[in-house]
Amino acid sequence: MLDKLNLDVTMTKEAYREEIKPLKERLAVLQHEVKNNGLPVMVIFEGWSAAGKGSVLSDVILQLDPRNFTAKSTQNPTTEEKREPFLWRHWRSIPRAGLFAIYDRSWYPEVGAARAEKLVTSAAALEKMDSINVFERQMADDGALIIKFFLHISQKEQKKRLDGLAANKSTAWRVNKEDYRNNKQYHNFYR
């Protein structure tokens, strides 16, 4: 599906700022409606490393009332978390009624990366994907609104952005060997 996208379409930063401004204002209003109606909302940002998830998240949360949302950056599971059931750590971050939970990555990369790098069998990956489907279905059945975004860039653009981040002293910390290794294996993750 992603291979059908035209990645040559661009937007200037100025055009982006103009288009996003009324949407951010609307988001602030919607957050209060969510609070008043007791709706739990899960907003998930996924995408390639260096695709801009952090920048988009920063831009979005500036409009929100900090009393009514949590932001979670999902990292690799800790030793303790690996001893627990697959989704245990994610169950702990579910928003209460009336609140937003905003995820910088979620439960998907654990399965996707393990599958792409052939660290698990296809059967094990399918079992985890089934667990994700059940988890999300339970959230939706209990009234949660789940909104998912995937920020897509080409392998070439990702490499360019990783190099740019690595070359800048103030952003070099954001890039590691795993990012470059994953970039070389881009098509394993892509399929």
Where are the language model's segments positioned?
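Glycine-rich phosphate-binding loop of ATP-dependent small-molecule kinases
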Residues: 1-191
